[in-house]
């Protein structure tokens, strides 16, 4: 594996809620693709330990979702904190992409970036300032070509690695059907 500035870093976080100032990251995963969206490597998938007091603040949706997926229990058992998760993830992405080259890639990625800025600032700073947000295309298709949305199937497990795989597949779908490039 060699660093390539054309590679893309895909990231997804699972959090205890949507408020970057008060909620916490509980899972992080990364995938690196080439510029044509071919997966080159999957990074570590890490459940991040949070104290019970943090987990207790989850709203009903998050409590149900992360409880049913098993993530809440993985978080309780995890010995990995945010700093170690940041270090391990940086170690992975730095093998594939030089600093400040890849946009941060994913779905609704601005939300993840806000959490990274507070909880994992070195990782957030590793990305280019631009975002490759698949949600932008999703919103445009919903408004301008809603019939095209029917061809897209998503599982929506709300597990970080699954969500990244679905984001990459979704962008491929938009490239092939909407952008036709």
Swiss-Prot record:
GO cellular component, one term: cytoplasm
Family affiliation: Belongs to the oligoribonuclease family.
Key words of the record: Cytoplasm, Exonuclease, Hydrolase, Nuclease
A Pfam family the protein falls into: RNase_T
Keyword Disulfide bond on entry: no
Single GO molecular function: 3'-5'-RNA exonuclease activity
EC class (word): hydrolase
Higher taxonomy: Bacteria, Pseudomonadati, Pseudomonadota, Gammaproteobacteria, Methylococcales
Stated role: 3'-to-5' exoribonuclease specific for small oligoribonucleotides.
Keyword Cytoplasm: yes
EC number: 3.1.15.-
Protein name (record): Oligoribonuclease
HAMAP family the UniProt entry points to: Oligoribonuclease (MF_00045)
Active-site residues from the entry: 129
